[in-house]
């Protein structure tokens, strides 16, 4: 073996050893990477981050599958089903899942039904309590109603007592209850039951009253007008009509008040009646035109002191009403001012009473011009309030500007923490100064 062969063999051996060592290092690195973290005070559980156990997250954490989260609140009904929002929309028929209304009524309540031989062109949105197929007309039964027409000739059968031997046709079983789990009553459930009800004309719906079978009331209009009225009601009825009746339709006074009654009767209530009271209620009642002697008799009872001096001999005091013990000059008690048929005269009498009493008792009144300005005044006429107000307006903006000025004899690299603290304190106090400014502005506006 030559030296070159020895050298090549050694080189291949070194390469294979290097490759083995590289694989060992890779395996060693993988094994060390898969090891669980050691137990310590900060990590008491040695469950690593790569474990296959699911992470139990809080419910507020957003995930990529929000459909598995629970709802934050219970799903309420639509607002149009409970509250009337004023939108007159066409009423949708009830869903197929809802149980039929006629199947749970007593026998006497079912007396009003359809004639199976005649089909009336009533809109599908007329009666929301009957189950129907939304694709077809609600009362258009077609050939299905004619299949069992021999059972409709006044047999007196009710809904809940049906004959057991009913001839079924394949047309009646378009969709059986067992074939469609979403429609447990079947698409022709109401049609099969309505065929066995004795034929009577469809009633006109009246205003629904509580504990009243007015829905099954006999029609009060001729049959020629029924369809017109029904179509009009169907186009104008709102969605929330079955659950919420508008109280404004059934009240005497349609008003926006919360109890649906006006605080005062309407003005037409007093239109053609002279004996009814005036709708404008005065402050006090004057039964008849008073004469001066009765008022002077009352004045002797209510005047202060038993002896009437010469200064108040011409005055009289009313014993009741809003004027109380206010001294009233006798010459102002004019019969034209105390007439009860006009409120303007009463108002004029009131103003004349007050004006005369102010003239008589002028010494007891305070001159408002004496206290028009603030009492505390300096010699130069500038009040303390104006000084403080001006100080509060001018000083805080200057403080703000001073707080943003650089600190002298300091460079950027020489700034210390105390400088930052002092600048922050400056700005906080400046903001407080702005608040004080607005405080003084409010005081000035209110004062």
From Swiss-Prot:
It is found in: Membrane. Residues 1-80, 115-184, 295-322 are annotated as: Disordered. It comes from the Eukaryota. Residues 300-321 have a biased composition (Low complexity). Signal peptide: none annotated. GO terms for cellular component: membrane. Its main location: membrane. Keywords: Membrane, Transmembrane, Transmembrane helix. Residues 42-51, 115-158 have a biased composition (Polar residues). Residues 11-32, 61-72 have a biased composition (Basic and acidic residues). This is Uncharacterized protein C405.02c. It comes from Schizosaccharomyces pombe (strain 972 / ATCC 24843).
């Amino acid at each position: 073996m030559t030296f070159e062969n020895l050298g090549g063999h050694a080189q291949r051996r070194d390469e294979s050893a290097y490759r083995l060592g590289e694989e060992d290092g890779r395996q060693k690195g993988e094994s060390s990477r898969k090891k669980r973290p050691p137990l310590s005070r900060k990590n008491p559980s040695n469950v690593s981050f790569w474990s296959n156990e699911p992470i139990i997250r809080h419910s507020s954490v957003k995930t990529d599958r929000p459909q598995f989260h629970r709802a934050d609140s219970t799903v309420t009904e639509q607002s149009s089903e409970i509250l009337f929002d004023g939108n007159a929309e066409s009423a949708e028929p009830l869903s197929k899942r809802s149980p039929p209304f006629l199947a749970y009524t007593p026998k006497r309540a079912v007396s009003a039904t359809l004639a199976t031989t005649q089909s009336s062109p009533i809109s599908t949105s007329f009666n929301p309590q009957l189950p129907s197929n939304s694709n077809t007309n609600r009362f258009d039964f077609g050939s299905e109603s004619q299949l069992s027409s021999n059972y409709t000739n006044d047999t007196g059968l009710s809904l809940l007592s049906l004959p057991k031997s009913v001839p079924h046709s394949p047309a009646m079983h378009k969709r059986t209850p067992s074939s469609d789990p979403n429609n447990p009553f079947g698409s022709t459930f109401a049609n099969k039951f309505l065929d066995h009800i004795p034929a009577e004309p469809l009633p006109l719906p009246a205003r629904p009253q509580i504990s009243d079978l007015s829905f099954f009331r006999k029609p009060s209009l001729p049959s020629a007008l029924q369809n017109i009225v029904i179509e009009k009601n169907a186009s104008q009825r709102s969605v929330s009509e079955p659950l919420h009746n508008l109280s404004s339709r059934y009240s005497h006074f349609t008003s926006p008040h919360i109890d649906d009654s006006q605080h005062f009767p309407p003005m037409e209530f007093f239109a053609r009646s002279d004996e009814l009271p005036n709708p404008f209620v005065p402050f006090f009642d004057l039964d008849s035109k008073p004469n001066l002697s009765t008022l002077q008799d009352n004045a002797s009872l209510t005047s202060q002191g038993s002896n009437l001096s010469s200064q108040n001999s011409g005055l009289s005091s009313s014993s009741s009403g809003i004027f109380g013990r206010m001294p009233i000059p006798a010459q102002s008690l004019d019969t034209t001012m105390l007439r009860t048929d006009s409120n303007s005269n009463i108002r004029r009498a009131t103003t004349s009473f007050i004006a005369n009493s102010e003239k008589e008792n002028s010494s007891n009144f305070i001159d408002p011009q004496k206290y028009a300005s603030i009492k505390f005044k300096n010699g130069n006429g500038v009040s303390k309030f104006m000084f403080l107000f001006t100080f509060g307006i001018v000083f805080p903006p200057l403080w703000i500007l001073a707080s943003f000025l650089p600190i002298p004899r300091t460079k950027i690299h020489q700034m210390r923490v105390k400088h930052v603290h002092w600048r922050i304190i400056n700005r906080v106090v400046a903001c407080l100064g702005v608040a004080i400014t607005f405080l003084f502005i409010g005081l000035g506006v209110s004062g």
